[in-house]
UniProtKB/Swiss-Prot annotation:
Disulfide bonds: none annotated. Heterotetramer of two alpha and two beta chains arranged as a dimer of alpha/beta heterodimers. Autocleaved. Generates the alpha and beta subunits. The N-terminal residue of the beta subunit is thought to be responsible for the nucleophile hydrolase activity. The keyword Protease applies. Catalyzes the hydrolysis of L-asparagine into L-aspartate and ammonia. This is Plant-type L-asparaginase. InterPro entries: Ntn_hydrolases_N (IPR029055), Peptidase_T2 (IPR000246). Keywords: Autocatalytic cleavage, Hydrolase, Protease. The lineage of its organism: Archaea, Methanobacteriati, Methanobacteriota, Thermococci, Thermococcales. GO terms for cellular component: cytoplasm. PANTHER family: L-ASPARAGINASE, N(4)-(BETA-N-ACETYLGLUCOSAMINYL)-L-ASPARAGINASE. It catalyses: L-asparagine + H2O = L-aspartate + NH4(+).
Amino acid sequence: MVAIIVHGGAGTIKKEERIPKVIEGVKEAVIVGWKELRKGSALDAVEEAIKVLEDNPIFNAGTGSVLTIDGKVEMDAAIMRGKTLEAGAVAGIWGVKNPISVARKVMEKTDHVLLVGEGAVKFARLMGFPEYNPITEERIEQWKELKEKLMKGEIKYWKKLGELIKEYPEVLRSTVGAVAFDGEEIVAGTSTGGVFLKMFGRVGDTPIIGAGTYANEVAGASCTGLGEVAIRLALAKTATDFVRLGMDAQAASNAAISLATKYFGKDTMGIIMVDAAGNVGFAKNTKHMSYAYMKDGMEEPEAGV
């Protein structure tokens, strides 16, 4: 039983007219991933699905990543193989089109797991990734609007981030991710531009193995939402532990989000999972989380928010 699931991020989609575009985006990604999965590689499926999401400016990853407090882009990404526990990640990278592909190169071409900032950019250039500007006009306008609110005192920037997000849900934007099982191996991957108005140098859960991204021989998980929550709970690894204890992917997803809600409240997290039986799971405590999945026996993806 093979399966793949993708997400386009947890949070609140303020403009209802964006929802069909978001659903179409995750469906497109899962179809591309499914085609790769049918060729036999969960690793290729996860990378290619996430690249589709990174290239779609409606999502907060790659092209269309949100801006830091000083108006720049700093992106995070990670990918992990469940069979070997190999992993690669980049944090605070800029000037590349597909951070997930750079993360894969970290996994395959180095002895390291995580490269950050200028080091990640230099590595990307060594690997042949060309200079690319992922900033879009829409993100610039959103940044200007939020920065104006900040300057007027409407947003108290030094408040706890969770409180800020409750008042201004537009600050929290969508991470993207994918998890796949090819019949032999589970692979998980995640990519994000982070949180709007984040401090320069801030790193979320996405590139932290075990927090936002994790895979082993029993399950894989990709998290989305307020990264600091996933880091404190080691949420992706915790979710796979639930599977090891006997839950399927859906029950483990529910348990992971219940844990996040218990400690940090609602409107904080979402998760997607696949287990080694080919079951998919997804859960959230936010208003929305776009997702799409396909598995054996399905001709069209199941998708929603």
